[in-house]
A protein has these predicted regions:
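Conserved FAD/dinucleotide-binding core of flavoprotein oxidoreductases
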Residues: 1-39, 71-74, 92-93
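C-terminal auxiliary extensions adjacent to catalytic cores
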Residues: 125-178
Length: 178
């Protein structure tokens, strides 16, 4: 507890609206950074995951998305599985090129769907009913994808992003919720 580090004038959240949190934070001291609390704009980024035929990035290296729905672990593990399948293919150039293209297509479509769902949830966060509806769309896709795996299917996309009807429904629902 260093006394030379100034307490921030304001924290990222207005704890005055939450008396129990304000009470908990009343005795808190800043540990880092010494300059105080900082804020920034969106930290999201997206790049194509294929650098070369045998140089692929995991989804979590190619995309940074807000952790609202905790998608990172699932996306990373699916990426490991997909990349291993690509590496296990024989050295056939055509077969590998097709698999790499499928990897990139799946990744980009999943990322687009996730961005739509997460951004919609944030836009309507102040309206609990709309926020709940936005989150339900994400979980409907996640659960359906898990069910497909349990049924022995091997979806090419996570979050049901390979189901055109679901993706179209998601777009329409997000548009209506916004």
């Amino acid at each position: 507890n260093r006394s030379d580090i100034p307490k921030p004038q304001s924290l990222p959240h207005d704890f005055h609206d939450y008396p129990s949190l304000a009470e908990l934070m009343a005795t808190a001291s800043l540990t880092a950074p010494p300059e105080g609390v900082r804020s920034t704009g969106r930290l999201q980024r997206l790049v194509a995951p294929s650098l070369r035929q045998r140089h692929l990035m995991l989804p979590t290296a190619a995309m940074t998305l807000d952790p609202l729905h905790s998608t990172g672990i699932a996306h990373a593990l699916a990426g490991v599985d997909r990349i291993l399948n690509i590496l296990m293919l024989t050295q056939s150039g055509t077969e590998q090129r097709q698999a790499v293209q499928q990897y990139e297509t799946s990744f980009l479509q999943e990322s687009k769907l996730l961005d739509e769902l997460v951004s919609t949830a944030y836009l309507v966060m102040n309206d609990f009913e709309r926020f709940t509806a936005a989150c339900m769309i994400y979980f409907a896709g996640a659960i359906r994808c898990e069910e497909r795996y349990q049924q022995g299917q091997n979806p090419t996309h996570l979050w049901n992003a390979d189901d055109r009807e679901f993706v179209q429904f998601s777009k329409q629902a997000c548009f209506a919720l916004r």
